[in-house]
Design a protein with these regions (language model features):
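ABC-type ATPase nucleotide-binding domains, specifically the catalytic core motifs of the NBD
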Residues: 17-19, 110-121, 132-134
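Conserved ABC transporter NBD signature motif
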Residues: 65-73
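Conserved ABC ATPase "signature" region
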Residues: 72-73, 121-138
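Short coil-to-helix segment of the ABC ATPase nucleotide-binding domain corresponding to the Q-loop/switch region
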Residues: 103-110
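Conserved ABC ATPase signature
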Residues: 143-147, 151-153
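Conserved catalytic motifs of ABC-family nucleotide-binding domains
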Residues: 164
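Catalytic Walker B motif of ABC-type/P-loop ATPase nucleotide-binding domains
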Residues: 168-171
Length: 224
């Protein structure tokens, strides 16, 4: 694709100091991600997949190297700037859903924008994306514990999309779902990608990875 990469890593390393010795989670990783790509990240347990995703999503900072988001270096930003960047540009989907148990489904979805958007508009936007996820209106007032796993993941995806992010990061998005429900979730992610979202997902499942157009493999913190 033409234009500036949405993500660029330059010799990025992440090292965790532990009493027993340093753990190198990522070792001099360089890569680029173009806008509109759909990428699967695969590798053995402990290979650095989640660390890579956390760095892509501004949830962590590298020990060494540089990370750029749409040409802007983010690897040395302040915590406040990283928080704003996550809020405005990035959506996250997690294996465990990470919904707030005491909030209703629609309140969970509008949560990322409630402080930056007036109440009426945040509710309208939340309902819009929930309907796009094929969630029945009757479920909007249900709390997460009253929803099935597939419904919870649809709510989680709606929450990730409510701020209309450029980049959607997914960590094992079908890991807690049965095959049929997982397929439905992957069709939703594929549709978001067709509508121009850049999607990067960590998965151990080759059938899930097959939805992506590129696969990045990590072994022992390095690109294989």
């Amino acid at each position: 694709m033409n234009g500036e990469p949405i993500l660029r890593f330059e010799d990025v390393s992440k090292i965790y100091p532990l009493p027993a010795g340093d753990v190198v989670a990522l070792d001099r990783v360089s890569l680029t991600v173009d806008p509109g790509e759909f990428i699967a990240v695969m590798g053995p347990s402990g290979s650095g997949k989640s660390t890579l995703l956390n760095l892509m999503g501004c949830l962590d900072v590298p020990t060494a190297g540089k990370i750029y988001l749409s040409g802007r270096e983010i690897s040395r930003m302040s915590d406040d700037d990283l928080t704003r960047l996550r809020r405005d540009r990035i959506g996250f989907v997690f294996q465990q859903f990470n919904l707030i148990p005491l909030l209703s489904a629609v309140e969970n979805v509008e949560f990322p924008i409630i402080l930056t958007t007036d109440r009426e508009e945040s509710r309208r936007r939340a309902i819009e994306v929930m309907r796009a996820m094929h969630l029945d209106d009757a479920l909007f007032t249900h709390r997460p514990g009253e929803l099935s796993g597939g419904e919870q993941q649809r709510v989680a995806i709606a929450r990730a999309l409510v701020n209309d992010p450029d980049l959607l990061l997914c960590d094992e998005p079908t890991g807690n779902l049965d095959t049929k429900t997982g397929t439905a979730i992957m069709e939703i992610l594929a549709e978001e990608n067709r509508e121009s979202k850049t999607v990067i997902m960590v998965t151990h499942d080759p059938n899930v990875a097959a939805y992506a157009r590129r696969t990045i493999r990590i072994v022992d913190g390095r690109l294989a």
